[in-house]
Amino acid sequence: MAEAATPKIGSVGRVTQVIGAVVDVAFEGELPKILNALETSNNGNRLVLEVAQHLGENVVRTIAMDSSEGLVRGQEVADTGAPIMVPVGNETLGRIMNVIGEPVDEAGPLVTAHKRAIHQDAPSYVEQSTESQILVTGIKVVDLLAPYARGGKIGLFGGAGVGKTVLIMELINNVAKAHGGYSVFAGVGERTREGNDLYHEMIESNVNKHGGGEGSKAALVYGQMNEPPGARARVALTGLTVAEHFRDQGQDVLFFVDNIFRFTQAGSEVSALLGRIPSAVGYQPTLATDMGQMQERITTTTTGSITSVQAIYVPADDLTDPAPATSFAHLDATTVLSRSIAEKGIYPAVDPLDSTSRMLDPMVVGEEHYEVARKVQSTLQRYKALQDIIAILGMDELSEDDKIAVARARKIERFLSQPFFVAEVFTGSPGKLVALEDTIKGFKGLVNGEYDHLPEAAFYMVGSMEEAVEKAKKLAAA
């Protein structure tokens, strides 16, 4: 449990008003600074309050990080003299903690050598790295068509049951294998059941060990749907603080946020409780500032990088809603998961035509990679345009050129699938991590017609093109 700083003389106040998650505290002596953590006990538990406003007459308005039911007027509150401090370091791997750094996985206390404040400034311009580099994930469809920037921000869009969690776990696994990096997962305002499932799936698929310890690759920080808005508005910052520590140790860190919309939603609830006048669609007037302050901390420095994958819920599928629209401004790439692709049994169900990346630029990825990616997309686009004709008239009515394009597109679709390490438990087929050179070489051969003689089935759920050729031989022999 994080120790509280020893209260200073004159830094003990008393509760004067409790309205839901907002608690007013009067101090006689020195007032605590904005964003300082105050502590009191509530129903026998430690309750942390974060200072949000100075109201005058020695009263501060605070936001509770846990339920305020049971607080009474006149109750003593101590100023810790610092912002919320959370444990950071390798001891956090394989563990689940809450917004104030307390372990919630019933695996004993979380003791670390270092603690860090959740509010930090973004790295200065001098510390930031300006190089554009790809973070190779070993997932063909991502690396070829919508590559991730090292230290970039990626938006992950997808409905329920199309494989967001499996993709997230595979990314955690591959980054640990290929880059030796750790991952931090921040569960912001999502279902507790999903958080529980993710924890157990990580143990089953060897991403984490039970109770942490050697071999664990990810730290989990949860502030789920049932938490008060104060916790949901800050839990992403807690996760980010853990990730920043790993980055400053020279690591390439993956930072997952599920769901970034809930961060904004919690900020909106807190803003209303603090009495701020709402802005467009009822959101907080500080929406862009809140988002910017968090997103600017996610970056590459000269020592290491934080690459962030953020699941984004789009309310009522309205992309112009201020919450998703504000997050789009910060993204370098988007990975869109499609139900229609998942229905074909192609996993990962990434939509090759809808997913985008600013890294797909010949100046960054090189001329060959860019040309191959564009050819793959144009072949798939042509197939999409011909699907109506095929549905009405059948394949026989197509020209010879179109028939070849359709055959290649179907092979490309299947070759974009690949077996995942974390899904070995369910599929029985060993996972594949494909090098970028092999991915480019394989798809280059496909679009140039070098593999037109191989059957479609040979390309399904394989890693490199060599495996597809081997599979074709086995199919022919069968």
UniProtKB/Swiss-Prot annotation:
Annotated compartments: Cell inner membrane
Subunit structure of this chain's protein: F-type ATPases have 2 components, CF(1) - the catalytic core - and CF(0) - the membrane proton channel. CF(1) has five subunits: alpha(3), beta(3), gamma(1), delta(1), epsilon(1). CF(0) has three main subunits: a(1), b(2) and c(9-12). The alpha and beta chains form an alternating ring which encloses part of the gamma chain. CF(1) is attached to CF(0) by a central stalk formed by the gamma and epsilon chains, while a peripheral stalk is formed by the delta and b chains.
Species name: Rhizobium johnstonii (strain DSM 114642 / LMG 32736 / 3841) (Rhizobium leguminosarum bv. viciae)
GO annotations of cellular component type: plasma membrane; proton-transporting ATP synthase complex
InterPro entries per the UniProt record, alphabetical: AAA+_ATPase, ATP-synt_VA_C, ATP_synth_F1_bsu, ATPase_a/bsu_AS, ATPase_alpha/beta_chains, ATPase_F1/V1/A1_a/bsu_N, ATPase_F1/V1/A1_a/bsu_N_sf, ATPase_F1/V1/A1_a/bsu_nucl-bd
Gene Ontology terms, MF aspect: ATP binding; ATP hydrolysis activity; proton-transporting ATP synthase activity, rotational mechanism
Sequence similarity: Belongs to the ATPase alpha/beta chains family.
Its biological purpose: Produces ATP from ADP in the presence of a proton gradient across the membrane. The catalytic sites are hosted primarily by the beta subunits.
UniProt KW Hydrolase keyword: no
This protein's name: ATP synthase subunit beta
Amino acids binding ATP: G158, G159, A160, G161, V162, G163, K164, T165
Lineage: Bacteria, Pseudomonadati, Pseudomonadota, Alphaproteobacteria, Hyphomicrobiales
Keywords: ATP synthesis, ATP-binding, Cell inner membrane, Cell membrane, CF(1), Hydrogen ion transport, Ion transport, Membrane, Nucleotide-binding, Translocase, Transport
Broad class of where this protein is predominantly found: membrane
